[in-house]
Each structure stands twice: as C-alpha cells, then as structure tokens.
Amino acid sequence: MNLDKVIAGFFIILAMTLNFGFFYGDSQDIIMHSKYELFAAIIVNIIATVLKLGDKTQMGSVLIASSLVADLQLIAAATLWTIYSTNNTISPEIFAITISLSGGALLANITSVILYIGDTLQSKR
C-alpha cells in the first residue's frame, strides 16, 4: 500500500463529498447551503490540487486540470456569495449562480475521482 496514494485519494474523495454536501438541497433555500461548507470544500479542493502536482504522467495532467476547474468554480462561487450578500441575504439570481458554479465543480470532482479510480485499477500491484 502506498501512503501517498492513500492520502491523495482521501483528499480527492473528501473534496467531492464536501462539494456535494454544499450543492445538494433546494437551490432557492439559503439555509440548505452553508457558507462554511463551501469554504471547507475550497480548502480541501486546493489541498487535493497541490497533492496532484507531483504526478508527471498524462493522467496526472488531466487530474490537475479537473482540480483546477473545480478550484476556479468554487472560488468564483464563494466570491459571488461574499460580494453580493448583504445583511445575511442574497438575491435568488446570485444564489442560483453560486449553486450552479458549485455544481460544475462537483462534476469536475466526479471526473477526477473516476479518473483516479481508473488509474488505480490499471496500476500494477
């Protein structure tokens, strides 16, 4: 068992599950989506991206690209939420965009997990 792969896999899967936790729920109900969970998803996604930087393979390049997409979309979602929220309220349009951006990041994270599992299954024991 390779400890580096275990740690990287842990953060890749944790990034996806935190992102799903933020994304899931009624897109019109702000109470269903925690800004702290969005912040945690951003931090864990950035950690997962940094852990992927050491992989010099073609698969590593695709994994880094998918992580960068997720990072960019989550940071954009948090930026929108921060800029447009006033007195703990946010317009439904901006909130819908925030949820949509996190959904795009979730797709990038799912892609990353599928590729990571595929790469693990193809590697020699």
Describe each model-derived feature in a short phrase.
Residues 42-57:
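Canonical alpha-helical transmembrane segments
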Residues 1-40:
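N-terminal signal-anchor transmembrane alpha-helix
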Residues 104-125:
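Membrane-water interface at the C-terminal end of transmembrane alpha helices
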Residues 92-106:
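Individual transmembrane alpha-helices with interfacial aromatic-anchor signatures
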Residues 8-9, 36, 60-68:
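Cytoplasmic-side transmembrane-helix entry/capping segments in multi-pass membrane proteins
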Residues 48, 64-82:
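Hydrophobic alpha-helical membrane segments
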Residues 2-6, 53-62:
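Membrane-helix interface "capping/anchor" motifs
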